[in-house]
Amino acid sequence: MDFVMKQALGGATKDMGKMLGGDEEKDPDAQKKEEERQEALRQQEDERKQKHIRMETEREKVRQQIRDKYGLKKKEEKEAEEKAAMEAPIEGSLTRPKKAIPAGCGDEDEEDEESILDTVLKYLPGPLQDMFKK
């Protein structure tokens, strides 16, 4: 019967104690190896970050050369100028700035409408002009 049990379980009986939290074989160098591995990972991460910083500085140099060549401004500079331009007229005002109404929208003067009507009437023949004027 023991033979059958050993064959059925295979070599698992030896590891069964370890699975249940029994005695574990401890490698005396395991802690040292783990520390070395952690240190190597930290070094790799530092190297990666330094490489990334170098690449970004090189890219920024190229971007600046292009800006200088074509007379472009940085996005931050452009936004700062726009903000300053928006705030300049507001400084002396006590009310908020009025929104500009595009042409053709909203209330229009009646004089504009009459002048358009007069312009159209000029191109009509005489009898039709009389009909529209009445």
Swiss-Prot record:
It is found in: Cytoplasm, Cytosol; Presynapse; Nucleus; Perikaryon. The keyword Aminoacyl-tRNA synthetase does not apply. InterPro entries: Synaphin. The keyword Coiled coil applies. It holds the Pfam family Synaphin. Gene3D superfamilies: Single Helix bin. Keywords: Cell projection, Coiled coil, Cytoplasm, Exocytosis, Neurotransmitter transport, Nucleus, Synapse, Transport. Nervous system. Present in electric organ (at protein level). One of its GO terms (molecular function) is syntaxin binding. Residues 29-84 form a coiled coil. GO terms for biological process: regulation of neurotransmitter secretion; synaptic vesicle exocytosis. CDD domains: Complexin_NTD_CPLX_I_II. Residues 1-114 are annotated as: Disordered. Residues 15-85 have a biased composition (Basic and acidic residues). GO terms for cellular component: cytosol; nucleus; perikaryon; SNARE complex; terminal bouton. Binds to the SNARE core complex containing SNAP25, VAMP2 and STX1A. Belongs to the complexin/synaphin family. Positively regulates a late step in synaptic vesicle exocytosis. PANTHER family: COMPLEXIN, COMPLEXIN-2. This is Complexin-2. It comes from Narke japonica.
